[in-house]
Curated annotation (Swiss-Prot):
Gene3D superfamilies: 3.40.50.20, ATP-grasp fold, A domain (3.30.1490.20), ATP-grasp fold, B domain (3.30.470.20)
Identification of the protein by name: Probable alpha-L-glutamate ligase
Binding site for Mg(2+) 1: D248, E260
Binding positions (ATP): K141, E178, Y179, D187, R211, S212, N213
Parts of the chain that traverse the membrane: none
Any GO MF annotation of the entry: ribosomal S6-glutamic acid ligase activity
Species for this entry: Idiomarina loihiensis (strain ATCC BAA-735 / DSM 15497 / L2-TR)
Cofactors required: Mg(2+); Mn(2+)
Amino acid sequence: MRIAILSRNASLYSTRRLVEAAEERGHEVDVLNPLRCYMNINARESSIHKHGKELPHYDCVIPRIGASVTFYGTAVLRQFEMIGSYPLNESVAISRSRDKLRSLQLLSRKGIGLPTTGFASQPQDIPDLIDMVGGAPLVIKLLEGTQGIGVVLAETRQAAESVIEAFMGLHSNFMVQEYIKEAGGADIRCLVIGDKVIAAMKRQAKAGEFRSNLHRGGSASLVKLTPAERATAVKAAKTMGLNVAGVDILRSNHGPLVMEVNSSPGLEGIEQATEKDVASQIITFLEKNAKAHKTRTKGQG
């Protein structure tokens, strides 16, 4: 197969591993910076160009699109879908998963366990918003944040009110969530491919920190999932419409709770923690499933 990987940095661990895994199986791989791709959209024959030349046809596309370039990156991916390339994750599903509030609304509709979450825009609603999620301590998250940036633990009601007022004053979109104390600063990253969890790791926050992101100094270790955790992760990925996803779960006293569904999960932490070849399993999925115009939206966007 001819495979395109949409990535702004060919030297990133995840991108390198996907290239290695694909080439080991005899596939031809090109790493394309989505910001350097541009589109010709017309009624006769749409195309994608780079450096003044039309790109060749790719059998499938692996999107590794950063959160900061979601709009343009998904537009490029959508163009690939329109001309018949099979996307590992579809543009619609990526856009859906990048909207944290929309994701939680979709997951809640399917009855998937979540931390109680509140969303409001007016200062007069702050007291009720805090009560809605069980009072302090509580977690306040900017909707645009990634890798733990823009996530605040407010340990008292006064602190919560101050942070919420500040975010409202800055006209930032944020949500308020109950704090799951029993999780102990740990979460579980489940790597879902198709309808299976193929790898899982426990991420533990460093001392004095509640965010378990590896980018924030958290540590990763192997973890054994319960059947409920496994089923929750698969159902969450399926609800988002993602073929490959990193599903972040908290262990609570009332079962697994989904924190986030990531459409472009990093491979380094989970491959090192589990010693599993995740990249090759992604390529295997493409070999079995990649067919022209085979998308849930039939390439219609």
